[in-house]
Amino acid sequence: MQNKGLIKLFAILFGLVSLYQLSFTFFGSKVEKDAANYASKMVPTNDAREKAIFERKYLDSVSNKQVVDLAVTNFTYNDIKDKEMNLGLDLKGGVNAILQVSVKEVLKGLSNDSKNETFNNALKAADLRLKSSNDTYLNLFFVEFEKLALETKLSDPTIFGTKSLRDKIKFDETNDVVKEILQQEINSSISTAFDVLRSRIDKFGVTQPNIQRIGNSGRIQIELPGAKDIERVTKLITSKAELQFWEVYSNAEVQNYFFSANEKVAELLKDNSTSDESEDTDKKNTLDDILGETSDSTKVVQKNLFTYLFPNVAQNQQELSSLVGQAKVLDTAQVNKLLRNKEVKDLLPSELKYVKFLWDYKPSKSSDGTELLALYAIKSNKKDKAPIEGDVILDASQEFSQLNKPEVSMTMNGYGSKLWEKMTTENAGRFVAVVLDDYVYTAPSVNQPITGGRTSISGGLMTVAEAEDIATVLKAGKLPATAKIIEIEVVGPSLGKEAIDASFLSFGLAILMVLLWMTLYYGKAGLYADIALAVNILFIFGILASFSAVLTLPGIAGIILTIGMSVDANVIIFERIKEGLFKKKGLKQSVEEGFSVKGALSAIIDANITTLLTGIILYIFGTGPIKGFALTLMIGIGTSLFTAVFITRLLIDSAVTKGSKLTFNTSISKGWFQNLNIEFLRKRKIAYIVSGAIILGGIISIASIGLKQGVDFKGGRSFTVRFDKAMNATQVAETLKGAFGSSPEVKTYGTDNQLKITTVYRIEDEGVSVDEEVQSTLYKGLKPYIGKTSYNDFKPGFEKAKNANGIMSYRKVDPTIADDIKTSALWAVFGSLLVVFLYILLRFRKVSFSIGAVIAVFHDVLIVLGVFSITYSFMPFDMEIGQSFIAAILTVVGYSLNDTVVIFDRIREFAGIHTKWKYSEVVDKALSSTLGRTINTSFTTLLVMSAIFLFGGASIKGFMFALIIGVAVGTYSSLFVATPIMYDTTKKEEKNN
């Protein structure tokens, strides 16, 4: 082996760099542990929110202080956080969201809210098409506009030929030119949204945030590992920062309308309860409009508006208030429906014609602990345009009022100052409201005109964090359009911590099993392979830390798979060396041949390249967990090759040079798989029948039963909910049917006191409050099982006690992005198959080899799908078909190809050496000679995967089950499917030659 010194130097330096990079993770966790201990001392109770505040204070206090001194250099806590290894949400907890900037809103803004019928009909048609299309909203709008336009052009003065765009869009400009301009404007708006969101996130206070644009889709991905206050995060990233100042009606001006509305609601409900359902459909529909999905006459106790809304009645001048009523937080959606009902709105007097009702931004607690939200009556107008808007704000900052309460101080420009002075002059003795994103933050009485352009937002319940966030969004600027969360994953820190513990336990056990097996099977050579394996693991984690890559649960699975591949490389080499020794060649010659291209190296490189190609395709087309898996897989392939080929070689060469006794077997493994001569091809028809029967059974199951699609493929919401006792999933599903209107999927998740609840309830509805309303519906539905747990404690976010009730993790996927995820996953599968087909064709120069490999892969995938279809209904773990499952399928593809390529490489070698043999004999002998390697590698890989499956977290069991089935089937198919099909598709004359 040449350049031993250089390889040693490189390995030592690489190892030291890896240790150096990983040290930051160690030091960072030590500081965070100190912060947690400090918080526990300051807050002796189990109040997770208070503890989080003190933790943050401690970390802020040491952020710029020296916490590590390495003599030659030192580091602050901020320095450490920048350099430590990033953990994904599934290991650390936090929020991962994909936001869709509303292109529709941007188009409406560019048209100055055009009332052109063709324009608005095209927007509506594009909305409908978007639900079932993977195309962009803008392209769909163009297609629909051209269908409806006839003679109308996009440059029409009533559409985009406006004053604001006249410098860019000329009169009678062609549609093609206008399309290009609109695309530029949309891109500019999305860039603005990206900059605004990045500015907000930078000031949020989490370490290692990540924000990136997703191609030209108008989507922005935000990752906030470790974020605990989920409600605060979602408000920060979805807030449009639309600040408005409005005049407000007093309670005295609205109360008579409320009394009339109350009577009307009572009348409608009474009519419904006394009418015959089959004859009075219209009235039933009216009730459905009012009560929505919860309408059930058996549940209504008091049949009027005031069942849900508590009016604030003014009987004299002293009782005048801007607060017109209150409602329980969980009843606000009901009040909204009632007040939006057409028959109720028809009762509005002329002076209240344009009134709009907005809620306070934060609930207050009544004397009995009930959370109540205040309702305000805003004096709107025909155009719904506020007298003063946020564009007049020059600066905003968090300060404290004279009463030492947190507030947001704002400074207006000259124009805004004049408008504010005018507004406060005209409304002396009345009320004005400061509204942010349709929530009222303050609605004080105006005592005198306010001059100078300074004002403040000072809600009585505002915290310092909330005031800081409001100042942040106001300074960062207004989003050009609504940013809707189309996919969000929330993992509570408790679940993340448990996932880390389970993952590293299973990881440690898996490694220990592999190390023991290699030593038991190969003796001293196995010990050298173990050392190389340990170096390989160090290199993988060192590279992840160096490049600030994110480690996730699927990423850990990727590392473990590469460990299996690293073992495979050593097994191939050792088996070749054993062959040389069996042929009475010297140890030195056998080692040299084993590590040569003509020996094991060719098969190792071919096998790893096919898996690498799969990893690249996964990384290009995959998202989320698939990307994390692909990244660790690709890194692991590189380090596995280096350690197996060079580190193991260095150790073995050193032993050979010193004349040490070197064994490649033990008393246990001696003689295994030697002198085998199995006639595989004679049994191929039996294999075809067995495989065909299994695949047919799977296809019948898929056609009749189907597969359980996860929310990332079909859209919906899934909640992982923990209870303080064991739960019956069927009973909970039946209970929730009443709350959601249809039966959700409920399954035990991990332990018997944890359930995964999946529902499509209100997934099509839009609006910033929908997610909150769905969570509140879930809370109400589960109330019989969670006792006195408050809604705030039930929601996801802060760390929960081991047996506390509440949402541990939450995921939502909009149906529009679900289609995109499914499409990209299918492209990943077919793309990897195509690339591998071409690579095998290039390497082996025969179509029959490619055909055999690809058919075997299809065989493996179909069997895994069939097993999932047949077993998902009764298996005690989650078996959803989603992104992680696709990652598992592609891993099966990679493993199966790896196995097949090693065998094909041996067939090619034997065909070149044994030219006098029949082709069938060549194939059988080649298969027999590689059987030891095939079984050994499969056994160690299955050993590793079984350890993870048994001891890993609940979130990875379905993933590992697919891999276990795939590896077992892949081993079988490489022997009994790929090779026989390759043989049967090889032309007769080629066999004879």
Q: What spans do the regions from the language model cover?
A:
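Hydrophobic alpha-helical transmembrane segments of membrane transport and translocation systems
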Residues: 8, 12, 535, 542-543, ...
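Short helical (or helix-break) motifs at transmembrane helix termini and adjacent helical loops
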Residues: 562-583, 604, 641-646, 890-914, ...
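Pore- and gate-forming transmembrane helices of large, multi-pass membrane proteins
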Residues: 197, 494-514, 533-534, 585-623, ...
